[in-house]
Amino acid sequence: AQELLEQIKLEKQKLIKEGKLKKSALSDSVIFKGDDNKYYEQIGKKCLDITEQIPFEIPVNWAWARMGQIGDWGAGSTPQRGNANYYNGNILWLKTGELNNGIIYDTEEKITQKAFQDCSLRMNKIGDVLIAMYGATIGKLAIVGEDLTTNQACCGCTPYLIYNWYLFYFLMASRDSFIKKGEGGAQPNISRVKLVEHLIPLPPLKEQHRIVAQIEKLFEQLR
């Protein structure tokens, strides 16, 4: 899995060169286990003991990473409701209530190209993973089946070289943790910052596919 993180780093460098990513995306940390059996995170010249943050042990060929390292994350926005030039277009625009823990092919509302340009909306591509960040829907998920935009309560992730369904099922398993992290305000709120800082156990790519196949087999038996 450390090799996978190296490949992800190379992929990011390529995307930065192509102008598709900001240079700041390269400032990743490295998480490793020391000879003293403690976990450390190297961020530039700083090395922090993060043993307390590690929720469980993983196989030796896996690695821990921050979710910000394994994908490009971004939320959407809501074009001004009173502007008739912004709605009834042909660009899919998703509200978090529509997240179905499956694949999204269509949305209740559509926006215009003008809304997309004026309102700093992120275009989520086919295969991207979506997660709700606020309120009653917090932690609800979907995989993008058709390119779409979202409101500000939804965060999208374009994974770098990791299996999108592995990320999807990891997020599903982490829902209680996100709800806990979101407590404290008038409504639960996990924010993009909390998402990108969340730890994810990263198996080699083949293992990710095997895990997903096993999960889907179990779900099939439960139906």
Residue ranges, per PLM feature:
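Extended, domain-scale alpha-helical bundle/helix-rich regions
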Residues: A1-C47
